[in-house]
Amino acid sequence: MSEPIDLSQIAPTLKAEILAEALPYIRRYHGKTVVIKYGGNAMTEERLKQGFARDVILLKLVGINPVIVHGGGPQIDHALKKIGKAGTFIQGMRVTDEETMEVVEWVLGGEVQQDIVMLINHFGGHAVGLTGKDGGLIHARKLLMPDRDNPGQYIDIGQVGEVEAINPAVVKALQDDAFIPVISPIGFGEDGLSYNINADLVAGKLATVLNAEKLLMMTNIPGVMDKDGNLLTDLSAREIDALFEDGTISGGMLPKISSALDAAKSGVKSVHIVDGRIEHSVLLEILTDQPFGTMIRSH
C-alpha cells in the first residue's frame, strides 16, 4: 500500500483555508452521485493518473459517490498498430469491424480498466471494474451514422453502438456497498454482438439514469474553445448549436458536447468540460469555487 499524501509541508493556516473552502461543497454533494468521464492525458501520465485515483478516493471518503466511465483511444490505437491495423474515424467515431471490436474489448475491458481499478485500490480505495455487458448494464443498438453529404443516407461504421437502455442496478449495488464503479463503454445488443460505444455518450446517459448531481468530462484542452483559441466558460444550448453549425466544435468534441448537452437537458444539474491535464482537476471543479473549464447549460 502506498504511503498517504504527505501534508506536513503545508502550513496549518493554509490547510484550514482549504478545508473551510471545501466544506460547503462537501455538504452540497454529500450522498450525491458524480459521473466522471475519464480520458486523455489524465489516463496516460503517471502523475495525473495517481492524482485522479486519490481524487476519487477522497470524494468517496467525504460521502460523495463517484462513478467513472473511461475511454482508451490511444491505448486502442497502440494495440491496433501492433497488429498492423490503422484506426479510422468518421464524425469522431471509431470505425469498428469485427477484428477491431475484439481489440477494443480486451484493451478497454482488460488492460485499461484494470489499470484504473488497481491504482485506486493501491491508494486505499475500493474500485470494481465493469463493462456494459456485466449485470445487463448497457443495452446497445447499432449506430446509424448519418451521411452529411447525402441526406437520408447512412454510413456503416461496423460494431459501433448507441445506448438503447441502461439498467443501473449493478452500479447502485456497488455504490451501496461503498465501492467505486469503473465502467468500460462496451454494450451488448439483442443480436448477440458486442458494441463499441463512445465513452462520452455512455457517461451522459449514465448520469441521467443515475440522477447524478454532476457530470464531469475530462479532456486535453482547457474546455470548449472559440475559433480564436479563447476559452468559452459558459455555453447555452443555442450557443452550442451555433458552434456546431460553424464548425467550431468538430471531430472528437462532437460526441462529447452533444452528450453533455443531452445530459443537461435531461436534468443533470451541473455539466462541465474540464482540463484533465491539470493535476487534481476533479477536486478543483467539485470542491472549490474556482472557475474551471466550460459549463454546459440546457437553456
From Swiss-Prot:
It catalyses: N-acetyl-L-glutamate + ATP = N-acetyl-L-glutamyl 5-phosphate + ADP. One of its GO terms (molecular function) is acetylglutamate kinase activity. Transmembrane segments: none annotated. Belongs to the acetylglutamate kinase family. ArgB subfamily. Pathway: Amino-acid biosynthesis; L-arginine biosynthesis; N(2)-acetyl-L-ornithine from L-glutamate: step 2/4. The record marks K37, K256 as: Transition state stabilizer. Its EC number is 2.7.2.8. It comes from Burkholderia vietnamiensis (strain G4 / LMG 22486) (Burkholderia cepacia (strain R1808)). Substrate binds at G72, G73, R94, N196. One of its GO terms (biological process) is L-arginine biosynthetic process. The gene is argB. It comes from the Bacteria. This is Acetylglutamate kinase. GO terms for cellular component: cytoplasm. SUPFAM superfamilies: Carbamate kinase-like. Keywords: Amino-acid biosynthesis, Arginine biosynthesis, ATP-binding, Cytoplasm, Kinase, Nucleotide-binding, Transferase. InterPro entries: AceGlu_kinase-like_sf, AcgluKinase_fam, ArgB, Asp/Glu/Uridylate_kinase, NAGK-C. It is found in: Cytoplasm. Catalyzes the ATP-dependent phosphorylation of N-acetyl-L-glutamate.
